Amino acid sequence: MGKYNLTALRVHQTALQQHAAGKIRAPPKWIDVVADIPPAQVLVRNQAAQHQLVRQRLKTVPGASKPQVAFEVQEKRIKSKKASRMFLPTEIKYEEDQLRREFFRDHPWELARPRVVVESSGRDFERYDWSRLQQPGKRLDGESVVQRQLWLLNNVPDMTRSAAYDIARREFYRLRLQEDIERRVAAEEAEATGATFGRSLLEVGMELENQQYERWKEWAKSEAQLQDQKTAAFVGAPEIAAHDEAVEPIEEKSALPL
C-alpha cells in the first residue's frame, strides 16, 4: 500500500499465522473479538472540525420573573484554504482572548510587571470568586481585569462588553491607586524609623539621560571639528580666504592706469 501502514489492520491475520507456525502456544483471548469486530479501515482523511465561539449571557425576557441564561454562538467564517493547510488543526478561540487583547492594547505597560505563573496545585482558579476584583493569594494584574469583566458579562443581566470593561477598569484603577498609597506610606514610615533607601528609578533614569547627553555633546563637537577640517581642505583656512578677498580689490585699483 505504499506509504500507508496497515499493520494494525492485519493483527488478526498475523496472530493466526504466528499460532499456526508455532511462535505462540495459544491464540490470544481477543482473537474472536477482533474477528467479529475488525479495526476500521478508513483511508480517507477528514478535515479538522471547526470550533465555534460560544458566549454565555444573562438576559431579561419579557414576561419572565427572572433573567434567563442565553448562549450565543458565533459562526466562524469558512475560508478557502490552500491544499497544504487544509488538514491543519483549527484555531481554538475563547472569549477571554478578545478581552485580554483589548485590555493589554490599552495598558501595554502592564505586561512589564513581574508575574507569577506557577500554581500550587493546578486548580487554584477554583478558589477565586470574580464577583470582586481582588482575590486572596493572587496579585492584581491584567488577568484579574479580564476574569472580572467575563464574570460581569456572564452574571449581570443585559451587560454589554463596553460597560463591563469600564466597571472592571474602574475597580482596577482604584486598587492600583490604593497599592501606590500603601507603598508610599510604608516608605515614609521606614524613613521615619531610620531606614535609608537608594536612588529612585526616576533619579537613576535622569542620571543615565544626562550621561548620554554629555556623550552626545562630545560626539557633536568632534563631528563639527571634522566638518570644518573637510571644508578648509577644499576652500582653505577661513581667515586666509577673508584676507585674500580683501586684498583683491586693492590690487585691482593699483592696476588701473593713471
Curated annotation (Swiss-Prot):
InterPro entries, A to Z: Ribosomal_mS23_fun
Subunit structure: Component of the mitochondrial small ribosomal subunit.
Pfam families the record matches: MRP-S25
GO CC terms: mitochondrial small ribosomal subunit
Name the record gives this protein: Small ribosomal subunit protein mS23
Organism annotation: Aspergillus clavatus (strain ATCC 1007 / CBS 513.65 / DSM 816 / NCTC 3887 / NRRL 1 / QM 1276 / 107)
One Gene Ontology MF term: structural constituent of ribosome
Keywords, comma-separated and alphabetical: Mitochondrion, Ribonucleoprotein, Ribosomal protein
Disulfide bonds: none
Family: Belongs to the mitochondrion-specific ribosomal protein mS23 family.
Compartments where found: Mitochondrion
